[in-house]
Amino acid sequence: MAVVPLLLFGGLWGAVGASDLTVVTCGSVVKLLNTRHNVRLHSHDVRYGSGSGQQSVTGVTSVDDSNSYWRIRGKTATVCERGTPVKCGQPIRLTHVNTGRNLHSHHFTSPLSGNQEVSAFGEEGEGDYLDDWTVLCNGPYWVRDGEVRFKHSSTDVLLSVTGEQYGRPISGQKEVHGMAQPSQNNYWKTMEGIFMKPSELLKTEVHHAEL
């Protein structure tokens, strides 16, 4: 099997089979790019001054900011084993690596656009059912090169960016919020990160599909 290099954190390189790079798996740590506005999903220990007062979630243009890494996990109160391929239509959690809080939404109004607030919530990776997002994509699995949407499992809004920009103390960062309407503003794709190789489960399913 051909082997290709994969760029990981801080210039660390690994080698995995080319066919293993296509699906996104649980346990992977990734950056997510909003393809319409070219910003990466980001969080930090800065709280909203309005709404819920929880940790803010933004979009940043910087490629190398470590506060833009998110771990892909199973939905609340479940475990998705490392290397398990994420299916289209599957609910997941996205846990912010540096703060341990989960991507979250609720019926608060976002500060700039007046859409639905998106925050980071919980402690050490554990929050509540409002941390669950359903992966919307074409085909059986979420694939690395494919654009996906994230639909909040409880309120049905889509994770979105429409270009509103914050001032101090987070000058230049874009608001991330939830919107009911599907549009180009709510497409995302994986970029940099550590991608866990798919487990044997996927290989078994592919074999059966070919029989």
Identify the role of each PLM range.
Residues 2-211:
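Lectin-like carbohydrate-binding module/patch detector with strong preference for beta-trefoil
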